Regions:
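Basic, low-complexity intrinsically disordered segments
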Residues: 1-91
Length: 91
C-alpha cells in the first residue's frame, strides 16, 4: 500500500518485505548494509507521532498481543523502492 507521510508517497518496510518475499528484518538488514545507497530522500524512519497516526488509519497494522513492532518502521519513497529492488536482487 502507498501512504502519504511528510507530503511524500511512501511504502512501509513491512509491505515491501511481503512484496519481495523476505522478512522485514532481512529487508532492513540489507538497507543497513547499503546505507550509502539510501539517502534521506529515498527512505526515512517514522517518528512515534507519524506511526501512531498511520496505525490508526490502517487495519493491517495489527496491534494484538505479540504482534506489535519492536521498532518504528522505515518508509521508502519511489526512488527508495527502486534502490531496494536493486539491493535485494543483487544477493
Amino acid at each position: 500500500m502507498i501512504y502519504i507521510v511528510r507530503d511524500q508517497k511512501v511504502m512501509l518496510d513491512s509491505d515491501l518485505a511481503k512484496l519481495y518475499g523476505v522478512t522485514t528484518k532481512r529487508l532492513n538488514e540489507q538497507v543497513k548494509r547499503n546505507t550509502l545507497r539510501f539517502p534521506s530522500d529515498f527512505m526515512f524512519k517514522l517518528n512515534e507521532v507519524e506511526f501512531l497516526a498511520l496505525r490508526s488509519q490502517i487495519a493491517t497494522l495489527d496491534i494484538g498481543r505479540g504482534k506489535h513492532r519492536k521498532y518504528l518502521p522505515m518508509v521508502f519513497t519511489e526512488n527508495g523502492v527502486a534502490m531496494l529492488s536493486s539491493v535485494l536482487n543483487s544477493d
